[in-house]
Amino acid sequence: MLQATLDEATGQPVETLSHPRGRRVIPAQSAALLRAMLEQVVQQGTAQDAAGLSGGAGGKTGTAQTGQFTPEGAERCNLWFAGFWPAEKPRYTIVVLQDGAIHTAYSGAAIFAQVCNALEAAG
């Protein structure tokens, strides 16, 4: 859980974050359906690069146009993946942003999977 925002130059906390107790905002049946749909995005949809994770995962890809172009005319886009892992009882929510991308070596889902694998290896 994120504890604080740090000053990049000094490493000192700029803002300490509080964590209010969670509360249900949608019915349990709706939440279960949404989770199942997000798991399908990983299993069969646009985020299959995260499909091999132990415990499964769910998530959503996204692309946002920036209106910025290279001198050659290619548009720079913001590529997103937001996911949770493991699927059944999520412990982590991870968001990957590839800012101003034209071509990427790895998808956001693949980067997400690498982070999850590192978390699993760390115990």
Can you name each region flagged by the protein language model?
Residues 19-24, 28-29:
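A structural-propensity feature for long, helix-poor, extended segments
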Residues 1-9, 13-21, 38, 42-123:
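Active-site beta-strand/loop architecture of penicillin-binding DD-peptidases
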